[in-house]
Amino acid sequence: MSEQQEQEQSDKQKYEFRKVIEELKGYQGSGTQLVSIYIPEGKLISDVVAHVTQEHSEASNIKSKDTRTAVQDALTSIKDRLRYYDVRPPDNGLVVFSGAFDTGGGRTDMVTKVLESPPDPIESFRYHCDSEFLTEPLEHMLADKGLFGLIVLDRREANVGWLKGKRVEPVKSASSLVPGKQRKGGQSAQRFARLRLEAIDNFYQEVAGMANDLFVADRHEIDGILVGGPSPTKDEFLDGDYLHHELQDMVLGKFDVAYTDESGLYDLVDAADDVLAEHEMLRDKELMEDFFKQLHNGDKATYGFDQTRQNLNMGAVEQLLISEDLRKDVVAYTCENGHDEYDLINSSAGTDDHECSRCGATVDADDGEREDAIDHLMELADQRGTETVFISTDFEKGEQLLTAFGGVAGLLRYSTGV
């Protein structure tokens, strides 16, 4: 599978998970009766069933009859679902949600959802019972991923590590032999200053060596390098060209950080929040810039569901741009005279009868075939060798894609006049 195909598969999986998360976040229990269970892939299913059985027994002590019944029903449903799995969960683990949610008017309904093989591995077993489903761990998995090198240093110590997605991984550390500013007796001021500068230089070389050993081999995978520490130290380190020249060119910024132990790596990520957010959206911004250039000065852009769909069918779309906040369904109608037409509707809206624009024949709402608009477009894109890219709404032109262009656009291989 090519890198582009892997990225598209990952984007599609993330979209499917995002839809489920949004649905789960919409459920509200009247008490602590919504159960969430996160199961890592190494966990024995039999151990999970035993845990659920124990929770079911303990739930009999809940004073509220409604809450007690709801929790026990949820746990029974979870046990039933777990029977479909063998010894262990699938790759990356398994998440099960179950519980009774309010539907209004004092009524409730039951929901059970099973999410297999999330985008990232589930790190630990977790049982959670509350008035809301626990979705935060999954939301973190859907955050934009990147690989960044981290360096924090002062003249006493240094730490280097990785930022992988949202996870900081400290890897190497070093302590310096740089003497304090007060010289020992018997040393001339000039000799002390020279020895101190040599010690500083040696320490900077040691830090650069750690960084080079860690980062150079992966330099083609790294999105950038962040450097933190007190102002004089980090400036001297970067201005002195101690880093490998290819790494030096990858430095995204330097940041004031008070601590240079392992905790300083976390402080560095916090200090670089704006830079990281900007970098995550860089590709989205470049694609939207290309789209607007073609829209105003060229003829290789299309937008809107109908036009983009036509261009997809022609095989003319190089890159399909979809707003990550698009929530629409497409309803396909075929009238009695064989005309195929499509309506784009809100995901929460009902389906209406359709009047064919070509012959005026009416198609009953029940005869329309409804599916998620993004799934519909991505299937066409897969068939035509078109790359699908989800565009964030966290910048101006990304927001415009959703609000002004219907959430769907495309960069074309050639002009079609459509």
Swiss-Prot record:
Keywords annotated in UniProt: Cytoplasm, Protein biosynthesis
HAMAP family in the cross-refs: Rel_fact_arch_1
SUPFAM superfamilies registered for this protein in UniProt: L30e-like (SSF55315), N-terminal domain of eukaryotic peptide chain release factor subunit 1, ERF1 (SSF55481), Translational machinery components (SSF53137)
Subcellular location: Cytoplasm
Keyword Protein biosynthesis part of the UniProt annotation: yes
Complex formation: Heterodimer of two subunits, one of which binds GTP.
Protein biosynthesis is among the record's keywords: yes
Domain of life: Archaea
Function: Directs the termination of nascent peptide synthesis (translation) in response to the termination codons UAA, UAG and UGA.
Classification lineage: Archaea, Methanobacteriati, Methanobacteriota, Stenosarchaea group, Halobacteria
Organism: Haloarcula marismortui (strain ATCC 43049 / DSM 3752 / JCM 8966 / VKM B-1809) (Halobacterium marismortui)
Gene designation per UniProt: prf1
Identification of the protein by name: Peptide chain release factor subunit 1
